[in-house]
Amino acid sequence: METYKDSTQVSKSSLKKKIQGFGGFLSGMVMPNIGAFIAWGLITALFIKTGWLPNDNLSKLVDPMIHYMLPMLIGYQGGKLVYDTRGGVVGAIATMGMIVGASIPMFLGGMIIGPLGGYVIKKFDKAIENKIPTGFEMLVNNFSAGILGAALAIISYVAVGPVVAGASTGLGSIALAITNQGLLPLIAVVVEPAKILFLNNAINHGVFSPLGIEQVQHLGKSVFFLLEADPGPGLGILLAYSLYGKGSAKNSAPGAVIIHFLGGIHEIYFPYVLMKPFLLLAVIAGGICADLTFVLLKAGLVAAASPGSIIAILAMSPKGGQLPVLAGVAVGAIVSFVVASIILKGSKEKSKDNFEEAQNKMKEMKKESKNQTTANSENVKNNDELVSSDIKLIVFACDAGMGSSAMGESILKKELKNANIDGIKVQHYSVDSIPKEADVVFVQENLSERARKSAPDANIVTIKNFLDRSTYEGFMKKIKK
């Protein structure tokens, strides 16, 4: 019976990692191009007929950007994830065939054919490795990319494009039906727990963004851009901890409120929920009520808001659409706060041990980080050697490589500067894009396996909260010796 239980746990853990890996791959195609999406969203919000500054001439930018530029960028990034720049070029060529072969924006198509283009050229290069006559390398490399890219573009135009266009239209119809039937708020039952498992970027950019862009074509805005980006439920959790929490959780919550609500880094509140899993009820309740408010008030954004900051959300709101958006965010925050407050106050009265366990978890983070830096990989044999010669690159990695990891990078850079330690580069990356030459990698606990796969020779330091300075203090003590 014990063996069965263990194998089941391993199976669940493996499935979770696979889902996270797939989600990370999807978001990895979109996140580096978020600036382009924001540019398109701003131009749309400003210059279309119903925009803030209607301009028939400048509004001509809207359609080419959404039909050509954005899908091409996704296709290029998808190919690049599989096989660097060469894969990106073939992925972009293949995506172009799909764009021309369909009358709707091919975001889903770019996510499919871009990585496929990268995969095809990668396999081709491997097949002809060490078989090219000396002096013909450039000729073969250039023509192979051109020929394979052209072939994939034709296949995409003739066969794949129409199929994906049909699938995209079908998904759009399903999304519209769900909205019309009033079932959209129930999506929070899936979305909010999935966010806590670090699938937030995959959900937002892999699922909701394509659906949202499809809806924008018809309605000029979409509620799908708000479902994951809404900071309300997380804000309620942090406010409840600020008033009714204890110890380090209470002390750190007010600072986390600013980072979450204004900075848009939602990962900051995940550890607070993980400390008390019952708080999932609070974020789910807040999410349902917020989504219901969005639907009733016909709220929506013109493009994806990333990061999920209230500033970005308001910037992506259509003209006259700010109040419905703010109302939904406020309702989500209030409901989440009320439910979380009841849970926190109830747990204090009924069992102090529960909260003490949560505090012990926070203390364990410090011990764990100290042990992790010495035990995760046996490369850390002599701390003095690491300072003088071994550590050249420290990487902070999160799912998307743009939010919480950047905060950790900033904190450690200051620690190194204060300690007068030079010559160590500190950078942040997506967990699936960690450079092989990384010496030390700081990563969230449930992404550690993906980090080891990306950088097998690095020392992995697991961390629950990138704002927890105790981890960095322990690390600094070791490299100062």
Curated annotation (Swiss-Prot):
- Give a GO biological-process term: phosphoenolpyruvate-dependent sugar phosphotransferase system
Positions on the Cytoplasmic side per record topology:
1-33, 81-143, 196-282, 345-481
Keyword annotations for this protein? Cell membrane, Kinase, Membrane, Phosphoprotein, Phosphotransferase system, Sugar transport, Transferase, Transmembrane, Transmembrane helix, Transport
Residue ranges of domain PTS EIIB type-2 in the record: 392-481
Where are residues bearing Phosphocysteine located in the sequence?
C398
Recorded hits in Pfam families, A to Z, give: PTS_EIIC, PTS_IIB
Q: How does it assemble?
A: Homodimer.
Functional summary from the UniProt entry:
The phosphoenolpyruvate-dependent sugar phosphotransferase system (sugar PTS), a major carbohydrate active transport system, catalyzes the phosphorylation of incoming sugar substrates concomitantly with their translocation across the cell membrane. The enzyme II CmtAB PTS system is involved in D-mannitol transport.
The protein's name in its UniProt record = PTS system mannitol-specific EIICB component
Source organism (scientific name): Clostridium acetobutylicum (strain ATCC 824 / DSM 792 / JCM 1419 / IAM 19013 / LMG 5710 / NBRC 13948 / NRRL B-527 / VKM B-1787 / 2291 / W)
